Amino acid sequence: MKRIIIVGATSGIGKEVAMIYLKTDCRIGIAGRRTDALKELQAIAPDKIEIQPIDVTQEDATDNLLKLIEKTGGMDLFLLSSGIGNQNIELKPDIEIRTAQTNVVGFTRMVDTAFNYFKQHGGGHLSVISSIAGTKG
């Protein structure tokens, strides 16, 4: 049975990917900031889904990802689907900083942790959902 970890699974593409994997013979670990949304998804298939609240902008995100991997029984595929994008016509620094914390620092935390897990365990698949908004405005 494949073990899939999805960070950013409480909405959007991450949630839809989790729903697709529910139809397969996989064990799924899902993470996101909204605990209530995680619990709603887990209620659909409590025998197949493990949950762990993770805010990728926080320093404990890496420890929480490792907890989720352990709960799920390991990891064969990691999908990072967390990210934000806001129009910031006035270039307010707080909006830019929050975006960078999520899309750069959070990305780095999660991908580094997943990569190192795979390196220690003989491989796996690392996948991310990103955007070209930075080049297209």
Language-model segments: residues:
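Conserved NAD(P)H cofactor-binding loop of Rossmann-fold oxidoreductase domains
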Residues: 81-87
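Conserved glycine-rich cofactor-binding loop
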Residues: 10-11
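Rossmann-fold cofactor-recognition segment
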Residues: 45-60
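Hydrophobic positions on the long internal alpha-helix
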Residues: 79, 110-114, 118
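Short alpha-helical oligomerization interface
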Residues: 89-101
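Residue(s) in the substrate-gating loop at a strand-loop-helix junction
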Residues: 131
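Conserved glycine-rich Rossmann-like NAD(P)H-binding loop of the short-chain dehydrogenase/reductase
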Residues: 26-40
